Amino acid sequence: MCIRDRGKTGVVGLIRGRDGGQSGRSLGLRADMDALPMQELNSFAHASKTPGKMHACGHDGHTTMLLAAAQHLARQRDFDGTVVLIFQPAEELGGGAHAMIEDGLFERFPVDAVFGTHNWPGMAVGDIALSSGPVMASTNEFKIVIQGRGCHGAMPHMGIDPVPVACQVVQGFQTIISLSLIHISEPTRQAE
């Protein structure tokens, strides 16, 4: 079964195990699938064929891994319960997961747990990293408004110049403790 339009462009697929899903157990596997508004500048065989769109963060790989898992599970069905395949849009620009949840993803397809994956180009081929809880960092947007006050050029002491204040804010960001700490631990190495 394949359901489209969860979170506008999300897709959900179901694969039932050898028991036809009767055990009631359900596991979600999730991959992000959005492209970024960037021009691909390489000539790899897997390069984007759509001008101005690029899977720069490996989302094409994430989607491929989930499709490969789906193919394997559909062929083997050597499990009990149901696997819910979640193809999430808008991961990079935010809101895709939230939109899918708001559209009733987990009411329609309740799961006991959800697992996701992310490539990590710096890791050796064949190694995997596992962790309970959050693994990758996220970005959050915020807005700072620095408001000055104009004055006559002969009386600068009567005004507030926002430029030096903005410079201090930018320099202050560089001292945030997160820039001094490693935000992720070393990955667990696979046994040889």
Language model: regions and residue ranges:
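Structured core elements
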Residues: 12-14, 28-30, 115-116, 143-145, ...
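Acidic/His- and Gly-rich active-site-bordering loop/insert found
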Residues: 4-55, 60, 64-67, 71-79
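Residues within well-formed alpha-helices
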Residues: 12, 68-69, 95-96, 165, ...
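Histidine/acidic-residue-rich, glycine-tolerant segments that coordinate divalent metal ions
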Residues: 36-38, 42-54, 60-61, 73, ...
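Single conserved hydrophobic/aromatic residue that forms the stacking wall/gate
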Residues: 1-3, 182-192
